[in-house]
Amino acid sequence: TMIPAPLFYVYGNHDGNYARNPPLGCQCIDGTVADFMGLRIAGLGGCMGDDPTNPFQLTEERMEKRVKKLQGDLRRGRKLDILVTHAPAAGVGDSTAFHQGFQCFHQLYRDNVPTLHLFGHLHRQNHHGPEARQGVFQVGPTKAVNCTGYRIIEI
């Protein structure tokens, strides 16, 4: 990586190559919970879609199964600090049919109350309204941040 900090990632809808050849010096947290310096970080990759040839396109039902499995892992410890996903939660910056969020992520918001939700997939220049253009959304106690391109966030 370019900065002296760890890099955690999840798969996006075009990341088939990362699955075959993971980037060096990075840690994939897709479908797992990582503890880093006292922070509990969970990751879920993929986006809305139903292309059976693309493992990173998921229906709402398939993602809901992944959320439930992740919540089983989270129940064994304290609350979630950071949620990292490729797609947003439904209603958080949605635009086209392909660029929709998952409703089941709201279950994670309710049950596990992440302080921060970092996501990508949505291109901010294609959205209307100040929240969407800035890419920062407040969903109850959770701050959801569109990290498309890049973001520097101090924790």
Segments from the language model and where they lie:
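Core catalytic region of metal-dependent phosphoesterases/phosphodiesterases
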Residues: T1-F36, R110-D111, Q134, V139-Y150
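Proline-aspartate-enriched helix->loop->beta-strand connector
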Residues: A5, L80, F105-L122
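Active-site environment of divalent metal-dependent phosphoester hydrolases
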Residues: N13-R20, G49-N54, A89-G93, T115-F137, ...
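Short, well-ordered beta-strand micro-motif
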Residues: D35, G43, I152-E154
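Binuclear metal-dependent hydrolase catalytic cores centered on His/Asp/Glu-rich metal-binding motifs
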Residues: M37-K79, F98-Q107
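Active-site-proximal beta-strand elements of phosphoester/diester hydrolases
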Residues: G38-C47, I82-H86, K143-T148
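Short acidic, glycine-rich surface-loop motifs adjacent to enzyme active sites
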Residues: R75-D94
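Contiguous, function-dense segments enriched for cysteine-driven chemistry
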Residues: G93-Q100, L108-Y109, H117
